[in-house]
Amino acid sequence: FKRDNNLDYAANQIVTSTGAKQSIANVVLCLVNPGEEVLLPIPYWVSYAAQVELAGGTIVEIPTKLENQFKMTAAELDSAITYQTKLLIFSSPCNPTGAVYSREELREIAEVIASYDDLYVIADEIYEHISYGEKHESLAQFDFIKDRVITVNGLSKGFAMTGWRLGYIGAPATIAKACVKMQGQFTSATCSIAQRAAIAALTGTLEPTRKMRDAFLERRNLILELLNDIDGIKTYVPDGAFYVFPDISSYFGKSDGTTTINNANDFCMALLNNAHVATVSGSAFGQEGCFRISYAASTDTIKEAMRRVKAYLGTLA
């Protein structure tokens, strides 16, 4: 936190967990009471909604626009807040869109949050090292709301340590203490072997991470070039993560003679069954009309996958 985000936390403000997903679940279960509202900008990572439901919270979705890279504006956030709102969960860089919030955008969001009492934020920053623009910006950098921000991170994305399962939070001490109690009823401490591996990752050079990021950038540029060559797909330039989230609604109502594409689920199943390319429907992320493609694959695989997608979509009428 100090090296990469210039955030100062005492030891009692840090909690390590079995992956960032558990870190988020701990916070949601500690903060959200039944019936309280949790704001989720659409599209959102699938686990956010499920965890809110487990806590008995009420999900309030905030629609966003492809033209704005699916980023929530401060005005959109402000209009969604009610007296029942307890928590906002958002990610930057974002899964599934790859959207990255700028410092100014985060400041505007922070000012809205500061204007409401007892509103907390989970800032999921798991993809912080896979950002293609300027340096990553953390919401908790703004001191006037730091005591209401829970910053979540982990080792799986920036250090390619998915199987080691280690995530962590920086949070107000009272929330961190509650998360320790909550986690103690599920998994207790994080695997000691994974913690040793994490020390090596966090204290070592970031050069391997930078090389990985540069490789993802090349793949992003490649997949955008290939997607832009397919009629009917509308996309944008994602600034982080390793996903793109195109709009494919122009294909709805079309058929290959056997299957009719009525929604994003149909679209993705048709690609799987006919082109043998696996993607994820936007409905899984709360955003009908789009689908997610991961470019965490070799350039050869990306080229072949996009060739198959283009060929199949060419059969639709």
Report the location of each language-model feature:
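PLP-dependent class I/II
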Residues: 2-317
